[in-house]
């Protein structure tokens, strides 16, 4: 996905001190952010001009100790054609030499009201999510008790109908039919809907419904971390399904592994309640309580007692 300086300005509500339409349309190609401290003393080895340049209180205070000519020289070297923008934090005053060098080199100058660390964190979070490589998977993503559950299965097995029932039970729809997944970092997988399918759910026999319009803003989310995969499968008498919770199946998406639970589907079974229970049980395991282990311990104790008798 392409992220422009204008998109960053709109997302973080930054003030444009200098920058025309062309400069604000510049693409940001990396989520890495540079604080040009060493560059201000003339050290440009390993300098990355393609990064956003963030000036905080430390850099600003040091600039005040320099002469006007030195300040201009520093910014003339920092600002390159490939530099997307420079952001000054805390609403600090923009040095005239910075503006002059920015105009000469075609670099937008932005100003934020937040602290430097807060601004840096917000920019990194936004850019990492927007610039991450995406993969589209078939399924439905639902937020169940704050946990992202990816529901997969054959076409027509009832994924969307199950998601609708979960929404009616107070959970939140993230994406239907196509889920765009991406890794925000090494161990965190996120999912979001395609823009054209935002808040929409397709129900066979009914058509497309707008979940936000019908059930309100509390029934939808624009994105969610993906923590569990539920695979719906047609029930077959000769098929073996996990009955104790011993299964350790996983799927890998974008290099991130998440647990997978296979659930058989047959007439009369309330799949949405089963998925809800599976999500709660998984969360309980994450918190240290394992019902399967409890059952095994009780069974072992019972066998021991019977053996003694």
Swiss-Prot record:
<feature type="active site">
    <location>
        <position position="159"/>
    </location>
</feature>
<keyword id="KW-0067">ATP-binding</keyword>
<dbReference type="InterPro" id="IPR027417">
    <property type="entry name" value="P-loop_NTPase"/>
</dbReference>
<comment type="subunit">
    <text>Homohexamer.</text>
</comment>
<feature type="region of interest" description="Important for the catalytic mechanism of dephosphorylation">
    <location>
        <begin position="264"/>
        <end position="269"/>
    </location>
</feature>
<dbReference type="GO" id="GO:0004712">
    <property type="term" value="F:protein serine/threonine/tyrosine kinase activity"/>
</dbReference>
<dbReference type="InterPro" id="IPR003755">
    <property type="entry name" value="HPr(Ser)_kin/Pase"/>
</dbReference>
<keyword id="KW-0479">Metal-binding</keyword>
<feature type="binding site">
    <location>
        <position position="202"/>
    </location>
    <ligand>
        <name>Mg(2+)</name>
    </ligand>
</feature>
<keyword id="KW-0808">Transferase</keyword>
<keyword id="KW-0418">Kinase</keyword>
<dbReference type="InterPro" id="IPR011104">
    <property type="entry name" value="Hpr_kin/Pase_C"/>
</dbReference>
<feature type="active site">
    <location>
        <position position="243"/>
    </location>
</feature>
<feature type="region of interest" description="Important for the catalytic mechanism of both phosphorylation and dephosphorylation">
    <location>
        <begin position="201"/>
        <end position="210"/>
    </location>
</feature>
<dbReference type="GO" id="GO:0000287">
    <property type="term" value="F:magnesium ion binding"/>
</dbReference>
<dbReference type="InterPro" id="IPR011126">
    <property type="entry name" value="Hpr_kin/Pase_Hpr_N"/>
</dbReference>
<dbReference type="GO" id="GO:0000155">
    <property type="term" value="F:phosphorelay sensor kinase activity"/>
</dbReference>
<feature type="binding site">
    <location>
        <begin position="153"/>
        <end position="160"/>
    </location>
    <ligand>
        <name>ATP</name>
    </ligand>
</feature>
<comment type="similarity">
    <text>Belongs to the HPrK/P family.</text>
</comment>
<feature type="active site">
    <location>
        <position position="138"/>
    </location>
</feature>
<dbReference type="GO" id="GO:0004674">
    <property type="term" value="F:protein serine/threonine kinase activity"/>
</dbReference>
<dbReference type="InterPro" id="IPR028979">
    <property type="entry name" value="Ser_kin/Pase_Hpr-like_N_sf"/>
</dbReference>
<keyword id="KW-0511">Multifunctional enzyme</keyword>
<feature type="binding site">
    <location>
        <position position="160"/>
    </location>
    <ligand>
        <name>Mg(2+)</name>
    </ligand>
</feature>
<feature type="active site" description="Proton acceptor; for phosphorylation activity. Proton donor; for dephosphorylation activity">
    <location>
        <position position="177"/>
    </location>
</feature>
<keyword id="KW-0119">Carbohydrate metabolism</keyword>
<keyword id="KW-0460">Magnesium</keyword>
<dbReference type="GO" id="GO:0005524">
    <property type="term" value="F:ATP binding"/>
</dbReference>
<keyword id="KW-0723">Serine/threonine-protein kinase</keyword>
<comment type="function">
    <text>Catalyzes the ATP- as well as the pyrophosphate-dependent phosphorylation of a specific serine residue in HPr, a phosphocarrier protein of the phosphoenolpyruvate-dependent sugar phosphotransferase system (PTS). HprK/P also catalyzes the pyrophosphate-producing, inorganic phosphate-dependent dephosphorylation (phosphorolysis) of seryl-phosphorylated HPr (P-Ser-HPr).</text>
</comment>
<keyword id="KW-0547">Nucleotide-binding</keyword>
<dbReference type="Pfam" id="PF07475">
    <property type="entry name" value="Hpr_kinase_C"/>
</dbReference>
<dbReference type="Pfam" id="PF02603">
    <property type="entry name" value="Hpr_kinase_N"/>
</dbReference>
<protein>
    <recommendedName>
        <fullName>HPr kinase/phosphorylase</fullName>
        <ecNumber>2.7.11.-</ecNumber>
        <ecNumber>2.7.4.-</ecNumber>
    </recommendedName>
</protein>
<dbReference type="GO" id="GO:0006109">
    <property type="term" value="P:regulation of carbohydrate metabolic process"/>
</dbReference>
């Amino acid at each position: 996905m392409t992220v422009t300086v204008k998109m960053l300005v709109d997302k973080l509500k930054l003030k444009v001190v200098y920058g025309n339409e062309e400069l604000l349309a510049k693409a940001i190609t990396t989520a890495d952010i540079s604080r040009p401290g060493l560059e201000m003393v003339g050290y440009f080895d390993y300098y990355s001009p393609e990064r956003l340049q963030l000036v905080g209180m430390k850099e600003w205070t040091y600039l005040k100790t320099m002469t006007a000519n030195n300040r201009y020289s520093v910014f003339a070297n920092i600002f390159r054609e490939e530099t997307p923008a420079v952001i000054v934090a805390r609403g600090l005053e923009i040095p005239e030499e910075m503006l002059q060098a920015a105009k000469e080199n075609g670099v937008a100058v932005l100003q934020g009201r937040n602290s430097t660390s807060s601004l840096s964190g917000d920019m990194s979070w936004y850019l990492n999510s927007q610039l991450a490589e995406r993969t589209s998977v078939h399924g439905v993503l639902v937020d169940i008790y704050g946990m992202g559950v990816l529901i997969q299965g054959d076409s027509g097995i009832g994924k969307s109908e199950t998601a609708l029932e979960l929404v009616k039970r107070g959970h939140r729809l993230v994406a239907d039919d196509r889920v765009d997944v991406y890794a925000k970092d090494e161990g965190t997988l996120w999912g979001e809907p395609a823009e054209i399918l935002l808040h929409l759910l397709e129900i066979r026999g009914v058509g497309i419904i707008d979940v936000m319009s019908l059930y309100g803003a509390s029934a939808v989310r624009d994105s969610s971390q993906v923590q569990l995969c539920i695979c719906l499968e047609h029930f077959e008498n000769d098929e073996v399904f996990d009955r104790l919770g011993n299964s350790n199946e996983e799927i890998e998406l974008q290099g991130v592994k998440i647990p997978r639970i296979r659930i058989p589907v047959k007439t009369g079974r309330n799949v949405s309640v089963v998925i809800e229970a599976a999500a709660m049980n998984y969360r309980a395991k994450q918190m240290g309580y394992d019902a399967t282990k409890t059952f095994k311990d009780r069974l072992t104790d019972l066998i021991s007692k019977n053996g003694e008798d």
